[in-house]
Every structure is written in structure tokens, then in C-alpha cells.
Amino acid sequence: MSLMLEPNPTQIKEERIYAEMGLTDEEFAMVEKILGRLPNYTETGLFSVMWSEHCSYKNSKPVLRKFPTTGERVLQGPGEGAGIVDIGDNQAVVFKMESHNHPSAIEPYQGAATGVGGIIRDVFSMGARPVALLNSLRFGELQSPRVKYLFEEVVAGIAGYGNCIGIPTVGGEVQFDPCYEGNPLVNAMCVGLINHEDIKKGQAHGAGNTVMYVGASTGRDGIHGATFASEELSESSEAKRPAVQVGDPFMEKLLIEACLELIQSDALVGIQDMGAAGLTSSSAEMASKAGMGIEMYLDDVPQRETGMTPYEMMLSESQERMLIVVKKGREQEIVDLFEKYGLAAVTMGKVTEDKMLRLFHKGEMVAEVPADALAEEAPIYHKPSQEAAYFAEFQQMKMETPKVENYKETLFALLQQPTIASKEWVYDQYDYQVRTSTVVTPGSDAAVVRVRGTEKGLAMTTDCNSRYIYLDPEMGGKIAVAEAARNIVCSGGEPLAITDCLNFGNPEKPEIFWQIEKSVDGMSEACRTLQTPVIGGNVSMYNERSGEAVYPTPTVGMVGLVHDLKHVTTQEFKQAGDLVYVIGETKAEFGGSELQKMLHGKIFGQSPSIDLDVELKRQKQVLAAIQAGLVQSAHDVAEGGLAVAISESAIGANGLGATVKLDGEATAALFAESQSRFVITVKRENKEAFEKAVEAIQVGEVTNTNEVTIHNEENEVLLTANVDEMRKAWKGAIPCLLK
């Protein structure tokens, strides 16, 4: 009997065993007070994992409350598996993004794969069919062999899981900066579709109803994964490989189909994914949200390893498992349904009225804890916040324009920067056409997926320029949301809502907490102005290696509604003779830019600035022009500035180029990263109508010369670049670095 080895309650207290599990002295004293006695080993484990930052948001809740979370289309905000937004005709879109950073740092293939699996379960546990996946990835520089290994394995893991399960990976972003070398970021997003009447909640209602366990069996993988995600990575992290779970996408495919059939049955009361903290979080949260209790008999848990203790079963994060509550007396229907898919469905407990979570094993009660205490009563910490030392210094710097000798060489060098370069090497490994609903494939501003049976589409994107946020968290936070919305608009979509993944360093450091606060302030303001509420998300703290934090990276996942698929617009030029317009003014803004990083090897100074009211006005004008059929192509101006944006629009086309004239100082005109700018092409016959509808400046026209030529206001040629050569450089950059 392995139970003999577990320390008794007195030992747990005297030897401070709780501290190894992640509880502080004060927290352990709180547990003692809640229970009116010392907790046993299993109970200490339950509290340690439910009160971790990963599950309780105890360090970030005061900040998260600033987000606007309601709107006329919002059907479900934060608090359930995923958020839900109405898209009309009794349909809704369900989406969420989550991080799997720490597991991916030590076991990149499985870490990334199970990140994808977990976020898919969050979406179908709401009753939705998953229709698309996206991701947002950060790595160190590709010159490092370790980074190459992480990059290749993470991409393979995402591809391996998504392709097997048959959900298209349609978009995302990959950025490279030295600060991510020891701590990559892997954020996965899933989007699903649902009819209003099918929406399910993770709630355990109805005393006497049956608690069932469905899906894969439980092993020792991932024990304390949530706690592991709530501490900094160190050399000893390698030893925590067992805390990384192993995914089985074929099992999950069956689980999706079984659960979507289950949702049509009136026998189902509630359903929740066993994610972080496994059985503990699913049971405690479902009971707490319903104001009920749950009793569970752990001998009935399907186990794939022998001699598992209650502690191990409750804290395992084995994948592809769900906890469901069904009406009493209807259990056999559920067993039969899951059996049809070759899956186990086992009765393992019941709903009670007294709000307690009780666990039984081998005939004895092994834990008795108030469900609310686990799910709702974690301490909330108002961490000290202090402006980062570098901030004032950066703010006071006069922004100098970098010295550029040769504009053409600089453009080619920028196109080969891994953050700008083609990500085809990445997305060619993903099946982005499975389910045959993908209208706009990876590589344009946003992906678009058809809403079957309608003329509508969903536009989706992930965005975050972490460098801007490092330089100025509040301004950068605004830009992250605005850029996501700009990408949706350029694709013909109306921005609906966002999910976020807040990736930061250690919140116990006041300067890091300041970054969190300020970036959330900026994001919240942008969400209010652009009317894109936050409907759910995830916080990932402690992204540090050897005390060095990553850049603050609050990734934005946004979904927009394309009201009619004929509005779908992409970034590449369409035909020679079309007029090229630029919307928005260019300033000499180079802080955090690709050019600054490339020339100086570091970033400094002020980030670009943004006026959210101006941003909103421009987005509305562009979207109206697209919906009126006046726009041929649209592309947001981001990393690398106008020269890169115009080149990308040419690279995506076949045999087309452009002749363009840009005013102002040449380096800024070409490469500055000022916000709220678009490159738009318009048919000549629509010139008047377009200029009436949109404040834009005509800068040139699309040609069939296969060259991009840019002049200054004196009509001197700044650069002429062959589009085939640019395409070759842009497409070859990442494969070349990986060789």
C-alpha cells in the first residue's frame, strides 16, 4: 500500500511539506482555518493546485477585472470553458486561447500538442463544433541550435495534433527575440460554431444526479502541471518532464464526436474538460458554480497505472478526459453512447446539496473540503507595482531615425528577418484545408472560415507586438488590440470580441506587475473604443529563465464576422492599373521596430503611438468601403513599415508590381512603424467613390512589370526591387536559417 508513505497532517505542517507543493505559510494557515483542522496529504494537494496562479488567478484577478467583458453580442463571458458571441441566425461563435509555455520549454512536441488538445476540449465542452485553430508562438533567435530544436518540435507538435484530429490550423503568428530563448511561448486558440440552444455549462446541478468520467484513462502524467506552470523555469525544470502530458489526437477526435452527440441528449446536465488540475478543478468548479457539492468514488476512476493514490488521481493531468453530470437513472444511455465510439463512460459519484467535495477510496473518506473553498476562495493578492526602471529613460529619448545607406538592401534584409519573413515553412506542415471551409488560407492579414449553410464567414487572427509593449506597456497594449482589429477589417470582417493570453514574467517582481497592469489598461481602453469585449482568456506568469523575463506578451486572439463572403478581401494586389492608396500618416517612429532591432541588435526609445479614436474611424471607413465593393486588396502596415507592406502585397500576387511615390524623409517613409495605416488598392473606375468614402492618399498604381519601384516626392527613385527576387528572399529566410 503506497498510502503508508504519505506524510500525516502533523508532518505536513511541521516539515512544511505544503511549501514544496506551492502553498505559502499564510495560505496553509488559511486552509487550516477553513477546515477547522490540519489537512491530510490529499487535501493539501487539492488546495495547492486549485490555489496556484494557473487555476486561481490569485495574482492577476484585480487586474483582469479591468477588462470590459459585456456587449450586445456576448452570450458567455469569462468563467466558463470558452466565451461565446452571437453571430445572428441563432448561431454563435465560441473561442478561447490558452498558453502551454512551460511544458513546451522542456518537452516541445508534447507540450505544444497537448496545448492544442486542451483548447479544443474547452471549446467542445461548451457544446460547439471546433472549426479552426490558430496559434501565437515566440522563440529565441534561430541561430541557436536549442531554439531551432524547440521551433521545429513545437510546430511539429501543433501540426501532429491538429492534422490528426481534422481541425484546420488556419492562422497565427511567429516572432523571434533573444528574450524567449530559454522560455518559448506557445499560445493556442480554437474557434467553434454552435446553435444557441446547444450551449452547455460546466455546472453540477440537481442533488442526486450522477457524476460520470468519460474519455481516456488516468495515469501519472501531468501531476502538478498547474503548479509547475506557476513557477519560474530553471535548470531543474528538465527533471519535470513527467509534468508534461502526452496527447492522443485520435482519442480526442472520438471524444469530440461523442460529446457533440451527448449534447443533443436531455440526459446531460453539465460538462467540463479535465484540464489544469484534472479531476480536482473539474469537480470543484462544477460543484461550486452550481452551489452544490460532489461525492466521488476514486476506485471507479479508469486507471492505466497500478497503485495510484487519491492524490495522484486527483492531480493527474492526463489528456482527453471530461467530467459530466447526467440525470439520475439515465446513466446506461450515456455508457451506450460512448461505447459506440469505443470510449469509456464510468459512474464515479453524485451531486450533493451540502457544497462539500468528498472523496472516497478503498472504503474510506480520503478528503472532505468545501467546493467553494477550492474554486472561489483562493486568496487574492494585490501585488506591489513599480514603474520599470528603463521606462522613463526610454520615454525621454529623442527618437532618432536610423541611418540607412542603401534602401533596396535594407528592404531585402528586412524581408529576411524571421519575424517578417514568410512562415510558409510553418503552415505548410498544417492541414489548413481539412473540413473544406477555409476561404482565406494562412499568409494574409486574417484567416477566414465559411459558416456552413450561410453566406457568412468568420475572420480570425492572433496579434501582439511584444517589443512595443516592453517599451511602453500601456501604448503597446492598445496597439495589440488595434492591430488585431485592423487585420480583421482588412479581411472584410467586423471585429466582434477578443480572447487574450497574458504571458509575463514573475508577478512577484514589482516591475513585472507594473507591465501587467499597464498593458491591461491599454488593452481595456482599446477594447472599449473598438467595441471588442474580452470573453475569456488565460494568464501565464513566471515566464523567466535564470531570472530573465520574456518581453511582456499579452497576445490578442480576435474573431470578426464577415457578413457576406463576397466581402472577403486579401492583401495581395489583384490587377495591373489598380490605384494604390495609403491611409494614415507616417511619423519617424522606430522604437521597437524591425529596422531598429536589425541595425542595433536591441530595442530602445518610445514605442509608436496610437490614437484609438482615429484608429476606429479609419477601420470603419475601410470596412464600409470593402462592404461597398470598392476595394481590391487591403493590407495593414505593421513590422517593417510601408516598404514591407507594399512588397508583401506584390509578393502574394503573380507577376504584378507597383510604382509608388512616398512623401517625407525617405527612411521613415519606407520603414517607420507608425500605427493605424493601411495599403489599399482600388479599381480605377471606383476612384471617386472610394475617395469620397475614405480619407486616403493615392500614392501610385499596380503594374505588370513584376517590380516594386518607390520614389520620393522629388520623383527620385529610392529603390527598385524585382518581385521574384523579393519572394525568393522572403520565402527562403526561415528554411535557410534552419539548415
Swiss-Prot record:
Residues annotated for Mg(2+) 1 binding in this entry: E98, N538
GO molecular function, one term: ATP binding
CDD domains listed in its UniProt record: PurL_repeat1 (cd02203), PurL_repeat2 (cd02204)
Pathways involved: Purine metabolism; IMP biosynthesis via de novo pathway; 5-amino-1-(5-phospho-D-ribosyl)imidazole from N(2)-formyl-N(1)-(5-phospho-D-ribosyl)glycinamide: step 1/2
Any one GO biological process: 'de novo' IMP biosynthetic process
Active-site positions on this chain: H54, H100 (proton acceptor)
A Pfam family assignment: FGAR-AT_linker
Binding site for ATP: Y57, K96, D500, G537
Binding site for substrate: S99, H100, N101, H102, R121, Q245, E317, S318, Q319, S540
Enzyme Commission number(s): 6.3.5.3
Reactions catalysed according to its record: N(2)-formyl-N(1)-(5-phospho-beta-D-ribosyl)glycinamide + L-glutamine + ATP + H2O = 2-formamido-N(1)-(5-O-phospho-beta-D-ribosyl)acetamidine + L-glutamate + ADP + phosphate + H(+)
Protein keywords: ATP-binding, Cytoplasm, Ligase, Magnesium, Metal-binding, Nucleotide-binding, Purine biosynthesis
GO cellular component: cytoplasm
Amino-acid positions noted as binding Mg(2+) 2 in the UniProt annotation, renumbered to this chain: D122, D273
Compartmental location: Cytoplasm
Subunit: Monomer. Part of the FGAM synthase complex composed of 1 PurL, 1 PurQ and 2 PurS subunits.
NCBIfam families given in the database record: FGAM_synth_II (TIGR01736), PRK01213.1 (NF002290)
Family: Belongs to the FGAMS family.
Function comment: Part of the phosphoribosylformylglycinamidine synthase complex involved in the purines biosynthetic pathway. Catalyzes the ATP-dependent conversion of formylglycinamide ribonucleotide (FGAR) and glutamine to yield formylglycinamidine ribonucleotide (FGAM) and glutamate. The FGAM synthase complex is composed of three subunits. PurQ produces an ammonia molecule by converting glutamine to glutamate. PurL transfers the ammonia molecule to FGAR to form FGAM in an ATP-dependent manner.
Database matches in PANTHER family: PHOSPHORIBOSYLFORMYLGLYCINAMIDINE SYNTHASE SUBUNIT PURL (PTHR43555:SF1)
Name of the protein in its database record: Phosphoribosylformylglycinamidine synthase subunit PurL
Species of origin: Bacillus cereus (strain ATCC 10987 / NRS 248)
